[in-house]
Each structure stands twice: as structure tokens, then as C-alpha cells.
């Protein structure tokens, strides 16, 4: 069963200011939590298009929401192809788009997907099971320098060099095949006092490898720009991020698109190309409530930002 506790459910969907007959996009279908709440607010004229790379998520949602008929459309695709895929089904503009950038719990909890450092499994970490690059390829084929870079940039891991050295030395004799082997090497690369603080010692490196395998930051940056272009004036974009790298991209993109650039003084009117595209709905991110944090530990790092097209 595809079970997943949706984070910031009401805040994210309500933040889109739903029009009952509007057209909306859920870029991250997952377990269908946001989609379910959004669909419940649409009338017969409304429509929801939901993206996911995961075939299991798509099939589950088709069954779950079959009663909505043509109001609910699934697209099995990475959301980096948002504009193209919508155009393929005749949609050129929408009333709202949401992103929930957390890895869905079923992916984390299915050991053979290789996302979790709590289960021993083959090194995979692909969101899209048809994609060519796996965690095995990254860990066994990428150079010491490349590993240091991703561990530091994507995982903000202080002991990136030490961990990369352990990986480099180990794979000279044998390929690193499982998450369990990788966890042990990470632990060896982190000094004992540091291992005892800040959560699981493998957390940051696993995050870094997952981001690299799925090219997550570049994909999100491109998709967010596409979303801003595709939303109608008055429409909104809601984004839930789970770590500082994603949040920085969202914050920077929203700020850049909601700010008027420096113009020469004395211009009678501001040319259209210099007018801000967005109005910020959230100056500061919305965080989960204490009640939600008690019920769902995975919500603790979630941040929600919302912007409206001018």
C-alpha cells in the first residue's frame, strides 16, 4: 500500500487560492495527499494534472481518483518537462502549481529502492526507475574530487574529504554494492565525537548522492522558472522544500521575479519587461505547526513559500 503522510497539506493547497473551475498542476503526486485535497475543492469544470516519475505512484493515484474521470490527468514524467508535457495535452496556462520536494515515504521505506540508510539494499536511489544513472555508478565510478564536491555542496558534509578517501580506498579492492557497505564507510570517515551528534552519520552523504543521481537542484530550478511562466496572472505557485539548498533556489527565484530592477530615474512608465512577474504571498516561509511535527517527524525541516503571478 502506498502510504505517505502529506506535509503542510492545508497550508499548501489553500495557499493556491483555489478557483473551483480552475486548472491546477501537482508536480509531485507521490501518495496523492495534496492532489486529494485539491480535487475535493474543484467543481466539474476544474481539472488537476499530476506529475510523477514513479510508476507505482501513478497507478495508485489512477485507482484512488478514478471517480474524478477526466478531471484528473496523470503524467509519468520528471517535472523538468512541465511546459512540454502540458502543451502535449493542449494546456498552455494554468491557475496554480504546487511542488512538494520531499522524497515520498514509500520510496524511503521500500528497501530495494536504496534511498534509506536504515535498510541494507542495492545502491540505486533513482526516482525514475528507467533513468540510467544510479547511486552505484556515482559511488564506484566518480572521482575522489567529484565525490568531495557533491558531498560538500549537496550534503553540506564537513567530513567530505575523509569520507571520499574511505570510498576511494575501499573500491580499489571491491565494488561498493549496498547501502549497508556505504554506511559503514561513511562512519569510518567521520570522527567518533562527530558521529554521536546531529542525527544519523550517513544522512548528509545519502542526501548528496540522491540529489546527484536525480539532478534534483538543476531540475527544480528549471521547473520553477517554467511554472512561473505557465501560471496565469492571479495564479499561484506553492513550493515545499526540505533542505537549505532547495529553499535557497526557491527564495532567490521568487525574489528575483518579484523585484523591479534598478532603472534610470525619470522614466514616465516602467516598460513591461522590467515589471515584476510575481508578488510574494509569504515574506517568510510557513513552517509546520507543533501538532503536525508531533504527528509526523519527517515534517521538521519543511518550509512552504508561495508567490502569485502579477
Swiss-Prot record:
Its EC number is 2.1.1.199. It is an enzyme of class 2 (transferase). One of its GO terms (molecular function) is rRNA (cytosine-N4-)-methyltransferase activity. It is found in: Cytoplasm. One of its GO terms (cellular component) is cytoplasm. GO terms for biological process: rRNA base methylation. PANTHER family: 12S RRNA N4-METHYLCYTIDINE METHYLTRANSFERASE, S-ADENOSYL-METHYLTRANSFERASE MRAW. Belongs to the methyltransferase superfamily. RsmH family. Specifically methylates the N4 position of cytidine in position 1402 (C1402) of 16S rRNA. This is Ribosomal RNA small subunit methyltransferase H. It comes from Bacillus cereus (strain ATCC 14579 / DSM 31 / CCUG 7414 / JCM 2152 / NBRC 15305 / NCIMB 9373 / NCTC 2599 / NRRL B-3711). The lineage of its organism: Bacteria, Bacillati, Bacillota, Bacilli, Bacillales.
Amino acid at each position: 500500500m502506498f502510504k505517505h503522510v502529506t506535509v503542510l497539506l492545508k497550508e499548501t493547497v489553500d495557499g493556491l487560492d483555489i478557483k473551483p473551475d480552475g486548472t491546477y498542476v501537482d508536480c509531485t503526486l507521490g501518495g496523492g495527499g495534496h492532489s486529494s485535497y485539491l480535487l475535493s475543492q474543484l467543481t466539474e469544470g476544474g481539472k488537476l494534472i499530476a506529475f510523477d516519475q514513479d510508476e507505482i505512484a501513478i497507478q495508485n493515484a489512477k485507482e484512488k481518483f478514478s471517480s474524478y474521470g477526466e478531471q484528473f490527468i496523470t503524467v509519468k514524467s520528471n517535472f523538468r518537462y512541465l511546459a512540454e508535457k502540458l502543451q502535449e495535452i493542449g494546456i498552455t496556462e494554468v491557475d496554480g502549481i504546487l511542488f512538494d520536494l520531499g522524497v515520498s515515504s514509500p520510496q524511503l521505506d521500500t528497501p530495494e529502492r536504496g534511498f534509506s540508510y536504515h535498510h541494507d539494499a542495492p545502491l540505486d536511489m533513482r526516482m525514475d526507475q528507467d533513468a540510467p544513472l544510479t547511486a552505484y555508478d556515482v559511488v564506484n565510478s566518480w572521482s575522489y574530487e567529484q565525490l568531495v564536491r557533491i558531498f560538500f555542496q549537496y550534503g553540506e558534509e564537513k567530513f567530505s574529504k575523509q569520507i571520499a578517501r574511505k570510498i576511494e580506498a575501499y573500491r580499489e579492492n571491491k565494488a561498493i554494492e549496498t547501502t549497508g557497505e556505504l554506511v559503514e564507510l561513511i562512519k569510518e570517515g567521520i570522527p567518533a565525537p562527530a558521529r554521536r551528534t546531529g542525527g544519523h552519520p550517513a544522512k548528509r552523504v545519502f542526501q548528496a548522492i540522491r540529489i546527484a543521481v536525480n539532478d534534483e537542484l538543476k531540475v527544480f530550478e528549471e521547473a520553477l522558472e517554467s511554472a512561473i511562466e505557465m501560471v496565469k496572472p492571479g495564479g499561484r505557485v506553492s513550493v515545499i522544500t526540505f533542505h537549505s539548498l532547495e529553499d535557497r533556489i526557491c527564495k532567490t527565484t521568487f525574489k528575483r521575479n518579484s523585484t523591479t530592477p534598478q532603472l534610470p530615474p525619470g522614466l514616465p512608465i516602467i516598460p513591461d519587461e522590467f515589471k515584476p512577474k510575481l508578488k510574494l504571498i509569504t515574506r517568510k516561509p510557513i513552517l509546520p505547526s507543533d501538532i503536525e511535527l508531533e504527528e509526523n517527524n519527517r515534517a521538521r525541516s519543511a518550509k512552504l513559500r508561495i508567490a502569485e503571478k502579477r
